[in-house]
Amino acid sequence: MLKAGNTLYMPIGEIYRKPHLWALLCDPIKGEDKVLIVNINTMRKNADSTCTLNVGDHPFIRHESFVNYANSALVSVEKLEDSLSTWRAEYREALKEKVLKRIRQCLLVSPHTPFDVRNIWLKIMKNYD
């Protein structure tokens, strides 16, 4: 069952690309059956440094990485479950609570977070301290 803190290893978007680690920021939204997700990339020049992750923050992370808020999205639970059942996505270890909290806090700080994602998060963040 998908829930806040889960991580998935899957490609970005509909067109096949190299898979990345994705983090679910919330439980499925009631009435919509969707979750808010962000992906984590290897640190590179000019990357969004609002929220950086390092070795120890998650077992999958082997070098400095960043949360790519520009690719954050609201995704249907059905779509993610379909990807999991057809092996286009794989579960990875859940995020530590303190890491999940940091990623959530930085979502509204990052200048790269899409406006629609900001608005969605503002509506649901009251459920997550």
Where do the model's predicted regions map?
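C-terminal terminal-subdomain/extension
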Residues: 57-129
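Compact nucleic-acid interaction/catalytic patches
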Residues: 9-12, 16-60
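Loop/turn positions that initiate beta-strands
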Residues: 5-7
